[in-house]
Each structure stands twice: as structure tokens, then as C-alpha cells.
Amino acid sequence: MKLLGLPLLLVLLAVTPPGCQGIIIPRCQLVRILRQHGLEGFVGERVADWVCLAKHESSYNTGAINRNKDGSSDYGIFQINSKYWCYNGRTPGASHGCRIHCSKLLDNNITDDIKCAKLIAQRARGLTPWVAWRNHCRGKDLRPYVKGC
């Protein structure tokens, strides 16, 4: 980064509203948080599955947003979709199953993200709604995701 670009970056970070920046949660911290929220064994999945899912959906970034071709968007560390689970005011045909505004899934507190992800997993009886989990985690040795934590 050029030296001239650093002050601009600092100014942009300073004017961004608190809670909207998102953070990268370190892997072992995420493991602890997920265990505290009862995800070990929830719908038959291990915490390692949830950590793998978060790694491949958002790279552990609580502020991640992905825009989809159908006009919906995916939000937060678990990339929760606006068509089915959260309200963003723009997605056509949305059902808002978690009854939460999508912006709440972008802050540094992932308690509401976990609550919504648990609802999704409970309704699906597993993690199959997440493409990244199906493609990168299902049926694989996921011990490295929790090793040392």
C-alpha cells in the first residue's frame, strides 16, 4: 500500500459506523463461541463442520456480503440468504424465516447469526442448505478445523 493511501484508509475506517465493519474471527475463538452456543452435536453435526462452513462461506468474516444472480444477497459469517432468512428491503419474494434484518448479520456479535443458522440447520436437518459445506466439508476429515483449540 502506498504511504499516501494509508491516511485515506484510516479516514474511511473512522467514518464507517460502528458494528458495520465486520471482523475476521480467529478460528479457535470461533470454535469456543460455537461450543458455547451448543453447536457440538446440533442436528448431528460437529463444531468442526460449522467452522469449515464458516471458512468456506465467509473466510470467518462477520461482515461478508455476497450478491447473487437472483437478486438476493448472503450475509455474515454463515452467508445467510435474504430471499429466505433475513430482511434487506430489496430482495423480491423474500420470506424472512429468521425474522431479522440482514444488517444485524454483519456486526461483530454473531449470536444472532448462530440463532438463525441453527434454525436453518434444524429445518433442513443438517447443513445441506450451505453449498460451501456440501462442496468442501461434507464427508471430509475436519479435525484440522478444531485442532489445538
Please report, for each region that a protein language model flagged, where it lies by residue.
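Export/targeting segments at the very N-terminus of extracytoplasmic proteins
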Residues: K2-N61
